[in-house]
Amino acid sequence: MADKVRRQRPRRRVCWALVAVLLADLLALSDTLAVMSVDLGSESMKVAIVKPGVPMEIVLNKESRRKTPVIVTLKENERFFGDSAASMAIKNPKATLRYFQHLLGKQADNPHVALYQARFPEHELTFDPQRQTVHFQISSQLQFSPEEVLGMVLNYSRSLAEDFAEQPIKDAVITVPVFFNQAERRAVLQAARMAGLKVLQLINDNTATALSYGVFRRKDINTTAQNIMFYDMGSGSTVCTIVTYQMVKTKEAGMQPQLQIRGVGFDRTLGGLEMELRLRERLAGLFNEQRKGQRAKDVRENPRAMAKLLREANRLKTVLSANADHMAQIEGLMDDVDFKAKVTRVEFEELCADLFERVPGPVQQALQSAEMSLDEIEQVILVGGATRVPRVQEVLLKAVGKEELGKNINADEAAAMGAVYQAAALSKAFKVKPFVVRDAVVYPILVEFTREVEEEPGIHSLKHNKRVLFSRMGPYPQRKVITFNRYSHDFNFHINYGDLGFLGPEDLRVFGSQNLTTVKLKGVGDSFKKYPDYESKGIKAHFNLDESGVLSLDRVESVFETLVEDSAEEESTLTKLGNTISSLFGGGTTPDAKENGTDTVQEEEESPAEGSKDEPGEQVELKEEAEAPVEDGSQPPPPEPKGDATPEGEKATEKENGDKSEAQKPSEKAEAGPEGVAPAPEGEKKQKPARKRRMVEEIGVELVVLDLPDLPEDKLAQSVQKLQDLTLRDLEKQEREKAANSLEAFIFETQDKLYQPEYQEVSTEEQREEISGKLSAASTWLEDEGVGATTVMLKEKLAELRKLCQGLFFRVEERKKWPERLSALDNLLNHSSMFLKGARLIPEMDQIFTEVEMTTLEKVINETWAWKNATLAEQAKLPATEKPVLLSKDIEAKMMALDREVQYLLNKAKFTKPRPRPKDKNGTRAEPPLNASASDQGEKVIPPAGQTEDAEPISEPEKVETGSEPGDTEPLELGGPGAEPEQKEQSTGQKRPLKNDEL
């Protein structure tokens, strides 16, 4: 038995060690549970967080505002963000960057680069020699790419979120415009990597808005489809989205609400910024007219003046949305000349007349892509700040033909709230109610390849093939597999955008390269040589369009199959064990797995994709990997495969149906042979049927990016280091400013305290003069040399002054604490003395305290009284300017020692059972002696709660010093004369615990 116990002890230790490790991991994880979202707009951003106990909250910035301008000011030795950077735009417009998101993923020849240069001529733009991307040249030493600037903004947004959440945050969902292509989305992901953020998803801002709308109206969604149109006009662009809300049946969670993006239309340059720029141009013209005869320079040539005019134009646009006219005025616009001019709403609408004509464009695009009419749209909801312009609402209302426009959504914060809900859903730390999101592909993607064919004997030609990989408005995230059946050697294929005819000529120029990637395969021929006896099933390329809308090539495989005889003896013990475990947890072996045997590589179920019709004789097949399907009765069934495009897909479907029928009829399967052949004789039944063995060989892949080359890893590492250095510099600057402010505040506060009576009472004139002189010298040093002083020097100067004033502050603080501490000590001494007196009056037959215990308490009481009187007498002899001998910490120590003794006796009284009284001949308890005092006769020991008076007495507990640690013991509160000694039963029938004042 002892040996068995010894064997179990190590196991228990291991179990406890594992529990400790798991608890440590959970505690560490609890510190990083918060997630965030960043609604990255052209003009401003909104940040939201979710953390335990704080569901979906918008983060306030340092100015306590819910919206932060996306502006960065970069100087040689400091950076400014948000409102601080906006104010710096007037002083240093060249170093202040705004609207830089318009340059993400753009090369030098993109029309948006020229448009940005025309709008903001104060910025000097240079170009990367390898990638031909844009860089901001701030000075000869400072140069930043748009990705780096965006990384700074994302890092700043994280700092705001961390300050608000009071814990570190790494996981984030970032919104991007729906019209961002692959290059622009990859640029945002690179910026997030530079900032050290883990991007859970890049969510389209229109999808985030639709999700926020659906989450807060979950009860209104039912099985009937509801089509809602969201019209979002922001600062830089306009997007119109048609969303269908409906309850659908899912395999994982049953009936759940779903939003599906049905149609999208957009205008990249239609927004509030263009209106402000036209107002700025109008104001600049008015100012030049006012100074026409003064030979003054054109105000457009002054960057500071133009920055002031742009700020005034922004304010003017907002005011004119609610007023018919307004007076624009700027003090000291240029050359100390003030500007003042009246602008009416009619003038503003005339300036932007062509912009208002473009308002219905995105609506028509969205309807066309969704293949819907306006009659099918139930409601049109406004989103975005620019939709507050009255003329925009008038034109839009006329275009959609509705009675009114919906304004029942927070136009500024809806996207941020939807994105943070998605962040919580993607995070493993939170459990949210499911909401199915089916986003849509805006730009179709296809695969192109060229193959040599023999049209006539001896005549060869090249045939160009195209296969649509992801069709326009198709759902994503999604995986696709394309199979090349007629290649036995290395070859190349190309991934390009599909038909972009829905874009205008100017939009196509802004879009950039329509070629994405060239894929070069290496090792195809070697794979055929490795398996000469196997039948080739083609070269399979696996594609993934992830949640962020970013396309990737997961892998390319060469697949071979052959028929082998199935023998039960060939199965090893390990294989049998694995099959048993799989059947237990996976519900049994699938027909495909049985057919392919143990050497197979499980593939996702494949189905023909749209637009994959081949020419006669073509064997290239496009398939879709199965994901958790959503049953939606409103969607039309997929088109049936035609011709020779998907022969393998048809066979797979037939085989699947056959497997299902076999599973439903096991008796028929047992009687019938393979392929429906009649049952074989008994002798032949012993032979095992042949099975397929599949072999998969990984093919080497070389990717040549054509749209925009990714930033090399070494360059990316340099950018990461650059941003980290800037962040460290900012932190050091903040630390230095904090030290300087602390030193300055200490000097002013102490100089003021020297003239207060309580400080003059405990100090001599010489002491105050010494301190005052040191403070004045430190103040002079801070003004003269403090500008160049380091953080360490400032902290050392502050420590020196605090040490000088330490004695003075100590004497004042002690005198402030004396009345309260001495009063508490007196109360405790009085209550303890009363408690001791009451304990000694307990009759001997009921006494629960020993003489040693009561003597010990009496000794502590007497020693405390003696210490107090002696210390007070000694303190009275000392002058107030000397260090006191009566210290508050000593008073607290004496109180703790006394309280510890009393608490011990109270605990003993609480848990000790009363002694049973002897009974007389009549069966009644003996009365107390006649000579007992009145107080003795009235005294009664109350038994603990839950025990009867007849219970057996328990042994006397050992003396345990409870509450011996400082701060764990409260002063005793004993009742005065007349306190009720007996306990009253509570309503529950139990007796409440004994209190200190009831003995």
Swiss-Prot record:
Location relative to the cell: Endoplasmic reticulum lumen
Alphabetical list of Gene3D superfamilies matching this protein: 1.20.1270.10, 3.30.30.30, 3.30.420.40, Actin, Chain A, domain 4, Substrate Binding Domain Of DNAk, Chain A, domain 1
Substitution effect: residue 419 to P: In IMD59; uncertain significance
GO biological process terms on file: cellular response to hypoxia; endoplasmic reticulum to Golgi vesicle-mediated transport; negative regulation of endoplasmic reticulum stress-induced neuron intrinsic apoptotic signaling pathway; negative regulation of hypoxia-induced intrinsic apoptotic signaling pathway; response to endoplasmic reticulum stress; response to ischemia
Chain intervals with Basic and acidic residues compositional bias: 611-626, 641-672
InterPro entries the record matches: ATPase_NBD, Heat_shock_70_CS, HSP70_C_sf, HSP70_peptide-bd_sf, Hsp_70_fam
Glycosylation sites: 155, 222, 515, 596, 830, 862, 869, 922, 931
Family recorded in the similarity comment: Belongs to the heat shock protein 70 family.
Entry superkingdom: Eukaryota
Keyword Zinc-finger: no
Function: Has a pivotal role in cytoprotective cellular mechanisms triggered by oxygen deprivation. Promotes HSPA5/BiP-mediated ATP nucleotide exchange and thereby activates the unfolded protein response (UPR) pathway in the presence of endoplasmic reticulum stress. May play a role as a molecular chaperone and participate in protein folding.
Pfam families according to UniProt: HSP70
Signal sequence coordinates: 1-32
Tissue-by-tissue expression: Highly expressed in tissues that contain well-developed endoplasmic reticulum and synthesize large amounts of secretory proteins. Highly expressed in liver and pancreas and lower expression in brain and kidney. Also expressed in macrophages within aortic atherosclerotic plaques, and in breast cancers.
Keyword Phosphoprotein: yes
Protein name: Hypoxia up-regulated protein 1
